[in-house]
Amino acid sequence: LTSREREVLALMAQGYGNTEIASRLVVTERAVLKHVGNIFAKLDLPHTDAGHRRVLAVLSYLGV
């Protein structure tokens, strides 16, 4: 993951949604969506509902 993708993933792990992440990183929500999509792809997460994929991404980040 890129450093920005790791930042986004860390904020996801803290429970922030896309809007809050965009605000904290001073980027557009569309940019956050792109980073989240890249995270899912790079972690090879299955195409399920977005909430489930976010949980899987956070678990991967935490090493669980």
Predicted segments, located by residue:
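Basic, Lys/Arg-enriched C-terminal extension of HTH/homeodomain DNA-binding domains
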Residues: 40-64
